[in-house]
């Protein structure tokens, strides 16, 4: 019984620490969205989408998942035009990009609390995410693998 009490107490302490980080971060992200910062990021990342073989419209999906969560990015993705040409290769590249960069502000703050430098974490996650997606896209283009259109 004592072990359950310790585990419960520890769980609440960890949850409290996460809420202290998550709630202010989400508020800041929402404020940045309201003042148009997300739109600036979308325009900034549009050329990157081209480099990764993705349509420009995907920059909104990328920015949303990077600043909030993969689920929010998928909601934005589901709102894209159904007639937008999209291949299985592009879906794979987008999925990999989201896996590397999702929830970046929250996770960087949590890593910083654990002793990891924020800049290093941002560089590693964004840099390796972009590099991995670039090479994955290059593989798909060179081999012609998974280039068939999919229906969103």
Segments and roles (model prediction):
Residues 21, 25-28, 38, 73-77, ...:
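Alpha-helical transmembrane segments of polytopic integral membrane proteins
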Residues 85-140:
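Membrane-core helix-loop-helix motifs of multi-pass transport proteins
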Residues 4-15, 37-52, 114:
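Hydrophobic alpha-helical segments of integral membrane proteins
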Residues 25-36, 135-143:
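Structural signal for alpha-helical transmembrane segments and their membrane-water exit/capping regions
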Residues 42-100:
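Membrane-interfacial helix-loop connectors
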Residues 10-32:
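Core transmembrane alpha-helical segments of multi-pass membrane transporters/permeases
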Residues 21, 25, 29, 42, ...:
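Alpha-helical transmembrane segments in multi-pass membrane proteins
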Residues 150-152:
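Conserved small/polar residues in nucleotide/adenosyl-binding loops
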């Amino acid at each position: 019984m004592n072990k359950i009490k310790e585990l419960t107490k520890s769980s609440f302490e960890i949850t409290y620490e996460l809420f202290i980080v998550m709630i202010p971060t989400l508020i800041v992200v929402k404020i940045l969205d309201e003042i148009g910062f997300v739109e600036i990021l979308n325009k900034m990342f549009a050329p990157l989408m081209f480099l990764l073989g993705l349509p420009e419209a995907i920059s909104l999906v990328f920015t949303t998942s990077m600043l909030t969560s993969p689920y929010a990015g998928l909601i934005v993705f589901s709102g894209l035009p159904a007639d937008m040409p999209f291949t299985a290769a592009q879906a794979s590249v987008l999925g990999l990009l989201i896996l590397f960069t999702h929830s970046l502000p929250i996770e960087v703050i949590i890593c910083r609390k654990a002793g990891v430098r924020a800049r290093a974490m941002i560089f590693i996650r964004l840099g390796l995410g972009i590099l991995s997606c670039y090479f994955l896209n290059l593989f798909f283009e060179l081999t012609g693998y998974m280039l068939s259109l999919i229906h969103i």
